[in-house]
Amino acid sequence: MWIVLAFVLTVAAPAYAQRATVRKPPPAPAPTAPIKAAPEMTCPTPLGVGVTTKQTFCDVMAGRDPAAGILIKLPPHKGPVTLTFDLHNRHTYSEEQTKANRAYARYTATIGVLAMDNTLISRAVVQNEFRKARDLVDRIGGGAGPGGVKAVAPTGDEPITITIPEEEGEVSILGEKLAVDRIDGSATYSSPGRPIAVISNVMIEYRPPPPKPVRKRK
């Protein structure tokens, strides 16, 4: 009798242990959906608004101090931020030179996207040739020229995509150098304060940080 009872207890113990409830860890919160939006941007030298595209164009000036560049403030985010914009060259349009077939110019502009501690994140380049008025991206309103447009206009259109590291809360865009080839010769410009290029259509894509857990009241 004692042998049978001992056997039953031995067998029943593992069965009881198997019926014990195992608590699973709570599921990880789903990642927040990415947001694409126009960022908060400070443009120290606006070129103006396009007559046709209605886009706002901003001059990129040469310089070495990030605080003096085009400032793009990044909202709170989780992971890297994707910065996109259109990069253009600058052309001073002359109807007289265009009709005389003497308006040809080839532009190569190089700019940098920097962290606020002056660390270079990435460079971007736009190169194009101007021959006729159709090579302009748009005309800029608010000028004294015919039709109330400015002589300076964006030419060339290079879509740029830059990945901003997660730890950055603000970045700066500064011009590095501009190479110009014309009928009468070539020149390179890089002195601080000189316009190097133009940007437009600035956007960012980012994931907001996950919401903070709500503390339960005791």
Question: What does each of the following model-derived ranges do?
Answer:
Residues 2-12:
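Bacterial N-terminal signal peptides
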Residues 9, 16-41, 210-218:
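Compositionally biased, proline/threonine/alanine/serine-rich low-complexity intrinsically disordered stretches
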Residues 48-61, 121-168, 180-182:
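Extended, solvent-exposed segments with strong compositional bias
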Residues 55-75, 80:
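Non-catalytic, beta-strand-enriched accessory regions in extracellular/secretory proteins
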Residues 77-85, 161-181:
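Noncatalytic modules at the cell exterior or secretory-pathway interfaces
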Residues 84-102:
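Short amphipathic, basic-aromatic surface patches that mediate peripheral association
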Residues 96-109, 191-192:
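Short coil-to-beta strand junction motifs in C2/discoidin
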Residues 177-218:
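Surface-exposed edge beta-strand/loop patches
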